[in-house]
């Protein structure tokens, strides 16, 4: 009987681990992470768990660094903005 209980417990643990892997499989990050493990220059984690990487061409005082408009929406304090791709920085509204 002990072997059957051990087998059931082991099967449950393996199933739980597999489910966790599937759930996290499409995610690169969790919010509040800086994505340094994914992006060479850091970046932001989006709501869907994907890293948006900072541009390597960031100019100091250009606003928050960006690679896409989505990054500026997240970093401009919720007021929106767009990415000035020429300087790699956000223009916040």
UniProtKB/Swiss-Prot annotation:
Keywords, alphabetical: Antimicrobial, Disulfide bond, Fungicide, Plant defense, Secreted, Signal
Family indicated by similarity: Belongs to the DEFL family.
Name of the protein this chain belongs to: Putative defensin-like protein 282
SS bonds (residue pairs): 51-83, 66-90, 72-92
Source organism superkingdom: Eukaryota
GO cellular component: extracellular region
GO biological process: defense response to fungus; killing of cells of another organism
Compartment list: Secreted
Signal peptide residue numbers: 1-25
Main location (coarse class): secreted
